[in-house]
Amino acid sequence: MKIQYSYLKNFLNTKHSQNRLVDIFTQVGFECEAEEGVIEFDITPNRGDVLSLKGLEREFYAHQEKKSNRKLETYKLNSIKDHKIISQTDGSGCGNYHLMLVEGLQIIKNLDAKKRSFIESAGVPLIHPLVDLGNYVMLEIGAPMHVFDLDKLDLPINVQFPKLKNNSLKVIGGDVKDIQSSSLTIQDQSGIQAIAGIIGGERSAVSSNTINIAVEAAFFKPETIVNQARKYGLATDASHRFERGVDPEIQ
């Protein structure tokens, strides 16, 4: 995992140099090295909890025997009464599943340059401003998010294993994948829209014309996601984190 030094320094609220931070995280137990303006961390598979700025902050302050005074901001949203958003969630594969509907967005061309630089330096490709914003949140707090074009969904959503055989999904990027019965899926009333915790389908992907969205935040159980990405030949930033386990309390 690569993290821009300037972002990490500000998030930790420290004046330490880049090399000093490398020394501290090495003492904590992480293999890391400094590159030009970036620190690369070699995170072992059992430490998925540190694949974010928030995770690194926790380790940093534990080493300093101090407590961070940073708190995640919470917002009170208007309740949605007109939609039945989620119909069914398979508890054996999904601990919790949330969708937030946002309507009437103003179309933006790009995130600001600072956020784009942070995302790119982490090795995450820039795709679309809405997707990029979700990836920014993932890098900050460790929670992968997926953004659907709301107008392309036929609500409500079901989170379940496929009940029918011969399912296929054209995933983002254009490849068509035959969906296995062992794969947890996100389905609307018209069919499969995403392979849970791995990748979304092209049919419900956001575009330059998107103005209404459904933002997914979920805890997919690691045992449900592990090895699934490999079966499909897909290695995504989301699957990398869900396989290792994300914090179910931050959704």
Descriptions of predicted regions:
Residues 1-251:
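RNA/tRNA-interacting regions in translation and RNA-turnover enzymes
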